[in-house]
């Protein structure tokens, strides 16, 4: 930690030196300002980046939070960002993804981590777009539970054929039903992390091999 | 003869015995919040003529029997110019005669011929709406149509601002619900079943012909009575500001039409006048004399960047919570079915409460812009930011003795539209993970470029002998002195903002700090708008040369800064217009 | 002081065409013996090694060893500007790699060198039990054949044949070639098709490719100039099938 | 058991290039007489018929009739992989059409057959009063000429000339060709330019095209192999102009 | 009445290829002496002048002067349809420019003329102190060389050499050519690379380009037909650098 502070101190003193030099040559009223120091960061394109300041992640345009993500997607994304930004290890990020994908495939994830929360904002009969949360809410109604405008529906996507919407079940009814690994891997975990990984140079193919469970090895094992 | 004080809410003019009379609508906030209409008969409209031959011009103008001629020394894009100030008897004379004046052999051009009379008054008197005015006057009997609690005062002395801004304004929001079982609401056949009203005056209610078991519902006999009750509330409460959401294009036109069909009287104006809806470009604008009507929908479109601007969406964005939503095309079913109607009542009340909350949050900034730009809140809330900046400059031009350029002709406008200045410098980010990243930003890059390089249409020159700042890439030359008009104005704005921020730091009063913060925010918005105006096709001070020079210098400064940063060991990984991120490489 | 002249720019172009699709930046080591480059791609899947001996060049001077870091994309842009009859001259100055083409006109390009910490990778130590040669063009054709059905390719070698194959959702493809070499131990491994495509951009380096293959081991592909004065080789990590 | 061998893969390629731009899936009927295909595009505007006789093939075995349904896009991907000197061998197994190219290497492709109900369309019975021949390339050029101004083309034939023309917003185009044939009854009709483009992809099938034309009738375009061992023909519905 | 015939359509095509990338619409002046065109691009950066003398044409009739306004994009679409051995015939009728290609078939195109007020620009009066000739292809190559590093190009000429150069963020490029002409006063100026690219599309007009250059003055580029019967020239405004 003291080593880290030393680097930061050196950089910040150089920042001070640089700003003093540059501002002494700028016209009156114009000033270049120091806006922040970040231990690590990556940029995807303009207006899309993530930086870490202490243990706080500053992110822009990366769709880091979507209300229909399950806890396992949010947690994995958070861990991936920390592996990259705090630990400086994209390789560790890949291992995190591989490990989560493996647990999902083995049926090794608790239901609480797979629950998707969505709020019902209108009468169920008024939804034109019948999404999974609407199907799950209707199933709750059929079971006698009260569902009205403002209710939070908690559902999971179970195994089976057919559209995802049709496989949305209230979590209260899902005990014993198997969740759909492909849905949680592709639509939740990989959706949450793939943009981040691609910004670090991992190709679509690299990410596909992670989610398929088939592994593209690296040469590291052969050195 | 008495001294009067009132917060100026709105302004217009009427004609009495062929004389234009400026009407100032205000409330005595220091006293009993009494509404006052002040009449000022002393003001006359005028325009400027730029002569080719001064004496010949005066001679030709004499023959037109104008009210008054006066030679003045002014500046036209910085150059000293003798102009003739031509005063008219009545504002309606201006459009009739100005073309004849322009066509005179001895007249090179006419200026400031299209400034509305009431705006001219605000500019020349240096008063601004939503500030307290003081003047001497004589109270006279109000005309019979004026509502009984409104006092009418004839101004006898000078009208001036006390410098005190209005706070704690009375706000009332309203919203109508229509029963339309067959498609889009049609005022010819679909009735209004509810009008909700809510405000900071301790009033939250839904007026309807049903719902008497609900404590917030006020029951009336029929739709006509519903409309008249709404009018009664507005007249009785006399809010300073009446707000709606999409009320310019829907609620007020609908109410007006239904009232006409039903024979209901809707004389909401302080002077007994009716609701009046005018066309403004592609939109409508609905005015009520004395009560400032603000439609929050266009305000929110300007203020926020959202995918949709429904009331529900805006409310969620501002307050982080969802409000009640019902499907608009099926509201009539809620009205027709007893078991659903209560929900409709709650929805209607929720609409006006939400509208009021939005108003409380967003109006302070608009009030501050009203004071800055100096035009009525009714107009400011419907103006694009570029228009706000332009009217601000018109006011400043008067103070500086600078002639206001004319708006572009249709052909000028068309040829300008195709051109666009090159934007800021962007260095595409380097992919991958970077360590030890430093972020640098220029503070007010473009405004300070305008000021430091004296970028203005009046300083732009072809003169190779002048001492000039020369723009990179394009080679445009801007004289180093004197200070250009726009740079001077922006400089004032930035200085004032710094002063206010210092004052904020020194204040212990939370309310004062809040007020000062809104003020500096308004100045910031105005300054940010100002540097873009050179590129607006319709702008009076449009100058593609100035717009291109600003961004060219912007690119030059950030590129040079990045290069210097390299010498200090900072490698830029991403840059965008006025800032960059760099890693330190020692 | 470094200076190297060559009558034929194609060698440089074909080498760096492959290298630039694998790595963004490389360190080139200049010495009296010649020009050398070792690089590992960002994801550590492909390793590339290039060696161009001093004898390859018509004129070669390097009086003290030097390491230069170059952006491969910029380098390729310049090399693509060479004409068939141009003489190409490489040199360095403070901060630039200089490439000059002498033909009808003298065209000089300076590429900014990159100031980065660069740790040269060492090649992994791998023992292979078999080695065989295939025409380079056949390898390229096999990749294009398999590309229509799959994004991965299985390479197999047995005592008689080298086989490239793939199975996809819409079809299968298989290419068999009689290699006529001694293979002691049959081998089979799966590789990413995209990664192999990157390697096979070096098609003017040599007419044949030497392949070393082992069960689930990296693919080693070696291109040697007929004159022995240059060598370009690649290592590609295998794809490991999931346990079922 | 079905097996067909051919020294020249181009015939297959050029035929299916046109067919695949007209229909996504086709049923191919395999019999002792040869290979036959009839297909109607999704919007029922273009009809295509292909016949390749057993005699066309160097070796042809089909001991019992068979119908296979093939995705034309996948088939084209494979046929494009043929080399000039490859010998091509077609066969079927349970669930696949197998295409093998024998050259320097043996390259085997299996295309999944589609399991669908398929009703073979019958060609409409149309009597034409005239028939003439034009060079295939001239037809292609006419389409490209008209393409710059219009998306539809008018074909006319009279006793001396075949004329292709169009009028557009920015200009007009007209191509006249002296056909030197007997035309009993002049004819005129309008067709979609895009649809004709699809048909004209079969440009290696024959050097000339036989055209049958009638007033507001479908265009019939027939390509016959010089050897008579194969025929590819199209019917294209006219565009009917609205009554003015 | 206007009619002009030419055995070689390439002259027209190469001229208008350059012109159409500079201006959207041109006015062509037809007279007994020939065909003439002067145009200034929308942003007033590039001026183009074309002159094709009556003698250039195999047959030329213009019994009274005429001015036609043509959309250059539409004109280019038609000219691109010419074949190598076509004879091209230009004429006008009420509202159209007619272009006919006679070859295996007769192909007639009518391009709508534009009804606009058009003020023909006059060329600026510029005195140059020097003039030299360079191979056209060398100029094109220089542009492509500089394009990899910069979007602007510096042209310099001194007593021995013509030099094209640029400095970019990632590298520099410089092309030197010994012109072997008398240059009284060295000159240097900077131009937009994109604008020069537009001019250099006329590469079949002449094998060499005549260049006039002056310090921070417009570039004048002139292409003369070997037969003297046609001339195509351009003026390009310089880019002015800011004082440092
Ligand atoms: Mg509403
Ligand atoms: Mg409502």
From Swiss-Prot, chain A:
Highest taxon above the source species = Archaea
Matching entries from InterPro entries are given as: DNA-dir_DNA_pol_B_multi_dom, DNA/RNA_pol_sf, DNA_pol_B_thumb, DNA_pol_palm_dom_sf, DNA_pol_type-B
The answer to keyword Repressor applying to this record is: no
Name by which UniProt lists this protein: DNA polymerase PolB subunit 2
Q: Which UniProt keywords apply?
A: DNA replication, DNA-binding, DNA-directed DNA polymerase, Exonuclease, Hydrolase, Nuclease, Nucleotidyltransferase, Transferase
The question of whether Lipoprotein is a record keyword is answered with no
**Pfam families annotated for this entry?**
DNA_pol_B (PF00136)
Q: Which gene encodes it?
A: polB2
Swiss-Prot record, chain B:
How the protein is activated or inhibited is described as:
DNA polymerase is inhibited by replication protein A (RPA), while 3'-5' exonuclease activity is not. Polymerase inhibition can be overcome by replication factor C (RFC) and PCNA.
**What's the catalysed reaction?**
DNA(n) + a 2'-deoxyribonucleoside 5'-triphosphate = DNA(n+1) + diphosphate
SUPFAM superfamilies assigned? DNA/RNA polymerases, Ribonuclease H-like
Keyword field: DNA replication, DNA-binding, DNA-directed DNA polymerase, Exonuclease, Hydrolase, Nuclease, Nucleotidyltransferase, Transferase
Enumerate the InterPro entries for this protein. Answer: DNA-dir_DNA_pol_B, DNA-dir_DNA_pol_B_CS, DNA-dir_DNA_pol_B_exonuc, DNA-dir_DNA_pol_B_multi_dom, DNA/RNA_pol_sf, DNA_pol_palm_dom_sf, DNA_pol_type-B, RNaseH-like_sf
Record's miscellaneous remark: In some Methanobacteriaceae the PolB protein is split over 2 genes.
On assembly, the entry states: Formed of a complex between PolB1 and PolB2; the exonuclease activity is associated with subunit 1. Probably binds replication protein A (RPA).
One MF term in the entry's GO annotations: exonuclease activity
Its job: In addition to polymerase activity, this DNA polymerase exhibits 3'-5' exonuclease activity.
- Bilayer-crossing residues are none
- State the temperature dependence of activity: Optimum temperature for DNA polymerase is 60 degrees Celsius, functional between 60 and 80 degrees Celsius. Exonuclease activity is higher at 70 than 50 degrees Celsius.
**PROSITE patterns under this entry?**
DNA_POLYMERASE_B (PS00116)
Protein name, per record: DNA polymerase PolB subunit 1
Q: Name one GO biological process term.
A: DNA-templated DNA replication
The EC number on file is 2.7.7.7
Could you read off the lineage of the organism from its UniProt record? Archaea, Methanobacteriati, Methanobacteriota, Methanomada group, Methanobacteria
From Swiss-Prot, chains C, D, E:
GO-annotated biological processes: leading strand elongation; regulation of DNA replication
A Pfam family this chain is assigned to: PCNA_N
Q: What transmembrane ranges does the database entry give?
A: none
**Which lineage is the organism of this entry classified under, starting from the top rank?**
Archaea, Methanobacteriati, Methanobacteriota, Methanomada group, Methanobacteria
* Organism encoding this protein: Methanothermobacter thermautotrophicus (strain ATCC 29096 / DSM 1053 / JCM 10044 / NBRC 100330 / Delta H) (Methanobacterium thermoautotrophicum)
Q: Does the keyword Metal-binding apply?
A: no
User: Which GO molecular function annotation, any one, does this entry have?
Assistant: DNA binding
Identify this protein by name.
Answer: DNA polymerase sliding clamp
Which keywords are on file for this protein? DNA replication, DNA-binding
* Family statement: Belongs to the PCNA family.
Q: How does it assemble?
A: Homotrimer. The subunits circularize to form a toroid; DNA passes through its center. Replication factor C (RFC) is required to load the toroid on the DNA.
InterPro entries the record matches: DNA_clamp_sf, Pr_cel_nuc_antig, Pr_cel_nuc_antig_CS, Pr_cel_nuc_antig_N
Tell me the function of this protein.
Sliding clamp subunit that acts as a moving platform for DNA processing. Responsible for tethering the catalytic subunit of DNA polymerase to DNA during high-speed replication. In conjunction with replication factor C (RFC) stimulates DNA synthesis by PolB, relieving inhibition by replication protein A (RPA).
Gene that encodes it: pcn
């Amino acid at each position: 930690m003291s080593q880290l502070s030393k680097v930061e101190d050196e950089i910040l003193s150089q920042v001070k030196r640089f700003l003093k030099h540059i501002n002494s040559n700028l016209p009156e009223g114009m000033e270049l300002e120091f806006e922040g120091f970040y231990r690590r960061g990556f940029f995807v394109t303009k207006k899309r980046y993530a930086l870490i300041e202490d243990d706080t992640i500053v992110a822009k345009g990366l769709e880091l939070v979507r209300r229909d993500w399950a806890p396992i997607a949010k947690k994995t994304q958070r861990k991936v960002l920390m592996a990259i930004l705090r630990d400086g290890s994209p390789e560790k990020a890949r291992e995190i993804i591989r490990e989560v994908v493996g647990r999902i495939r083995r049926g090794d994830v608790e239901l609480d981590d797979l629950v998707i929360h969505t709020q019902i904002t209108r009468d169920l009969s008024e939804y034109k777009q019948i999404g999974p949360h609407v199907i799950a809410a209707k199933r709750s109604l059929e079971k006698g539970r009260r569902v009205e405008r403002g209710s939070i529906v908690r559902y999971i996507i179970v195994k089976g054929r057919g559209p995802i919407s049709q496989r949305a079940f209230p979590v209260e009814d899902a005990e014993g039903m198997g969740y759909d690994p492909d849905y949680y891997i592709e639509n939740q975990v990989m959706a949450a992390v793939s943009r981040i990984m691609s910004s670090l140079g991992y190709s679509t193919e690299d990410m596909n091999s992670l989610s398929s469970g088939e592994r593209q090895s690296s040469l590291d094992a052969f050195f | 003869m008495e001294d009067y004080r009132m917060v100026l809410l709105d302004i217009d003019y009427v004609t009495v015995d062929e004389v234009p009379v400026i009407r100032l609508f205000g409330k005595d906030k220091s006293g009993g919040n009494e509404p006052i209409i002040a009449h000022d008969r002393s003001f006359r409209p005028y325009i400027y003529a730029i002569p080719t031959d001064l004496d010949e011009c005066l001679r030709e103008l004499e023959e037109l029997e104008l009210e008054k001629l006066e030679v003045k020394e002014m500046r036209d894009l910085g150059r000293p110019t003798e102009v003739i100030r031509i005063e008219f008897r009545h504002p309606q004379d201006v459009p009739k005669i100005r073309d004849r004046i322009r066509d005179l052999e001895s007249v090179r051009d006419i200026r400031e011929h299209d400034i509305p009379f009431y705006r001219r008054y605000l500019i020349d008197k240096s008063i601004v709406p939503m500030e307290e005015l003081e003047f001497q006057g004589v109270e006279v009997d109000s005309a019979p149509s004026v509502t009984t609690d409104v006092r009418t005062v004839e101004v006898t002395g000078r009208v001036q601002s006390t410098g005190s801004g209005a706070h704690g304004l009375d706000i009332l929001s309203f919203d109508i619900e229509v029963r339309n079982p067959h498609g889009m609401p049609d005022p010819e056949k679909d009735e209004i079943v509810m009008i909700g009203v809510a405000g900071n005056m301790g009033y939250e209610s839904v007026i309807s012909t049903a719902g008497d078991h609900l404590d917030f519902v006020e029951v009336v006999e029929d739709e006509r009575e519903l409309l008249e009750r709404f009018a009664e509330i507005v007249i009785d409460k006399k809010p300073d500001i009446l707000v709606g959401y999409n009320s310019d294009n829907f609620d007020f036109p609908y109410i007006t039409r239904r009232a006409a069909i039903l024979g209901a009287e809707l004389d909401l104006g302080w002077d007994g006048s009716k609701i009046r809806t005018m066309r403004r470009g592609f939109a409508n604008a609905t005015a009520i004399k004395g009560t400032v009507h603000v439609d929050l929908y266009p305000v929110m479109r300007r203020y926020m960047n959202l995918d949709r601007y429904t009331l529900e969406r805006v409310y969620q964005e501002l307050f982080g919570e969802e409000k009640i939503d019902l499907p608009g095309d099926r509201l009539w079913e809620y009205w027709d079915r007893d078991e659903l109607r209560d929900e409709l009542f709650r929805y209607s009340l929720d609409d006006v409460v939400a509208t009021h909350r939005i108003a409380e949050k967003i109006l302070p900034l608009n009030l501050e812009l009203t004071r800055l730009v100096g035009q009525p809140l009714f107009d400011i809330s419907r103006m694009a930011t570029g228009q706000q900046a332009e009217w601000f400059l018109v006011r400043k031009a008067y103070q500086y003795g600078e002639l206001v350029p004319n708006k572009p002709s249709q052909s000028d406008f068309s040829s300008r539209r195709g051109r666009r200045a090159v934007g800021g410098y962007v260095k595409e980010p380097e992919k991958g993970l970077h360590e030890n990243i430093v972020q640098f930003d220029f503070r007010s890059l473009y405004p300070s470029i305008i000021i430091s390089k004296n970028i203005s249409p009046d300083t732009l020159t072809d003169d190779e002998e002048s001492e000039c700042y020369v723009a990179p890439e394009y080679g445009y030359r801007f004289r180093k002195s004197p200070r250009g008009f726009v740079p001077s104005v922006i400089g004032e704005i930035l200085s004032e903002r710094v002063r206010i921020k210092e004052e904020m730091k020194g204040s212990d009063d939370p309310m004062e700090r809040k007020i000062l913060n809104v003020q500096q925010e308004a100045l910031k918005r105005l300054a940010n708008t100002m540097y873009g105006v050179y590129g607006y096709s319709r702008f009076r001070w449009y100058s593609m040369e100035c717009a291109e020079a600003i961004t060219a210098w912007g690119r030059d400064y950030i590129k040079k800064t990045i290069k210097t940063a390299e010498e200090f060991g900072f490698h830029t990984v991403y840059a965008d217009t006025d800032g960059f991120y760099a890693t330190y490489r020692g | 002081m470094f200076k190297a002249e060559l009558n034929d720019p194609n060698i440089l172009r074909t080498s760096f065409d492959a290298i630039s699709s694998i790595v963004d930046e490389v360190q080139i080591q200049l010495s009296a013996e010649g020009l050398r480059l070792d690089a590992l791609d960002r994801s550590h899947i492909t390793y590339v090694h290039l060696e161009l001996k001093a004898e390859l060049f018509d004129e070669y001077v390097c009086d003290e060893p030097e390491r230069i870091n170059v952006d491969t994309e910029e380098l390729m842009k310049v090399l693509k500007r060479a004409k068939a009859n141009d003489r190409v001259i490489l040199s360095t100055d403070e901060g630039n790699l200089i490439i000059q083409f002498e033909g009808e006109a003298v065209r000089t390009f300076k590429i900014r060198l990159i100031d980065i910490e660069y740790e040269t990778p060492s090649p992994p130590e791998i023992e292979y039990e078999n080695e065989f040669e295939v025409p380079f063009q056949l390898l390229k054709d096999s990749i294009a054949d398999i590309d229509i059905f799959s994004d991965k390719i299985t390479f197999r070698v047995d005592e008689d044949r080298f086989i490239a194959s793939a199975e996809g959702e819409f079809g299968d493809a298989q290419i068999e070639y009689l290699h006529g070499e001694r293979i002691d131990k049959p081998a089979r491994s799966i590789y990413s098709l995209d990664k192999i495509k990157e390697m096979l951009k070096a098609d003017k380096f040599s007419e044949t490719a030497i392949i070393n293959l082992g069960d689930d081991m990296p693919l080693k592909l070696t291109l040697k100039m007929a004159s022995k004065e240059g060598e370009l080789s690649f290592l590609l990590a295998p794809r490991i099938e999931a346990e079922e």
